[in-house]
């Protein structure tokens, strides 16, 4: 083995593990491993920057590299070799001057991985700019022209056929319902069961039957991206109907800030490696949306620094290429805009023109009511706020500013101390006015979160504790006294569609009424009857309000054990991770307990005692 690798470069996926294992084995036989080492994990992270996972199985799947028997030595080695060739191919596709810039940062790659960049650079004879623009040493994609929109057929099934989709009877009924709703001038509330393909069911009829722009609002950013990259992309490919994701400026990279960060070499190796990753990503992205970097959570502080503030100067080096600027232009030119409920409310509060003269579709409208509830209040963690104030005090050169900050710090600390003694939960009006006065005398960039919380729109303020396993977190809350009425956000001229599987809350009240609508049209598609489906309700289960976690868990365990005797597979769904873990701890039956970790993007097992019966 030593003779095989003596004059070679040692390449591995996670080379630190393999090289250390080999070096230890060779050492005991009297040899030293002196071969240069190259890590395909780090190289893949830099040159394929938008992947979610970089394990060998995951990246082979993304790059369509055959991996027949994962975790077997020969199969993994072959796959790593093919991955290495793919990485070299990607490097050689980049502009030569960009590769030179990456080489300047390549000492931040693990071991001797920079040798790969040197080797590729030596083989490049000319600049390879493809569809890229050199913008002060940062390569960006050239703007793509928006094609002329094609007319959709008035026949829903024909449009489906052009998209290569099969007809579904329930979806067609829903589309017909949307077409009927287009004819009336009142807000339309359409109820139809989940899973029938409602997105195409409302987009295609609205594009065919109306001329105005369409704004689609969904509850989450994830669903927002799914629609844009799924249905929106498919419709754009066939009908040239431009579909754009509408987000806050904070979602986009500010090129001026990134350019400045490139002029410094940070102490953190991984942060400098991240700069390499972003330089490659900028040659690929058309949006500049930082969420395209799936592992952004690893560099949270740096990404917050790079996030756009919504301001762009005409003197900027990147004026005309700024991503927030370009996204605003695309939003104005696009026929379909997709956003999320929270951002929609934030924009409409200040600017109703966003949807004026347009069609607004609120998908999963039942979630809008919850968003309105959240919109009527705001909170901030007091410990972090006090740390921010202390940092500002230590950095401020103005005596007046320091005195004002110290005053705010003292008042907040006193309020928290009284709260923890149990004497005062609600913040009195005179203290709020004092804090507002101090803030008004400070420069506008100080304590932005506290300024937003103490905004005049909030009328009631209080302190609240959240208890976690290791610590207690105190938060300052502000809220409106009355529930926000959605109608107050709307301009006079807008066509409204509210779509959900659950619009009817009870016989006495509907979602339309909760949102503040009196005159509206309700359309209902009866749910499909599943003859083999049965639902049982446990009438003996006690009221959950005030029920201790341990008692709640024990009651669930008892019911699982009774159901276990049916010999049918059991799936138990929880809304609380703590309850899941408590049940798993008490359950003696073989089972698999899992919960999702958003930070790591995967399901974590809490107990693995596999059984075909309980999951």
PLM regions: where:
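Conserved interdomain hinge at the start of the Helicase C-terminal
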Residues: 538-574
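Conserved helicase motor "Helicase C" RecA-like lobe of SF1/SF2 P-loop NTPases
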Residues: 574-597
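Walker A/P-loop
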Residues: 183-204
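A contiguous, basic/glycine-rich beta-loop/short-helix subdomain that forms a polymer-engagement track
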Residues: 311-335, 350-351, 435-552, 588, ...
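Signature of the SF2 helicase/ATPase Hel1-core->accessory helical subdomain module
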Residues: 225, 229, 317-336, 341-438, ...
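Acidic, Mg2+-coordinating catalytic module of metal-dependent nucleases/exonucleases
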Residues: 6-16, 20-26, 49-51, 55-118
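A substrate-engagement module of RecA-like helicase motors
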Residues: 153-157, 212-214, 218-335
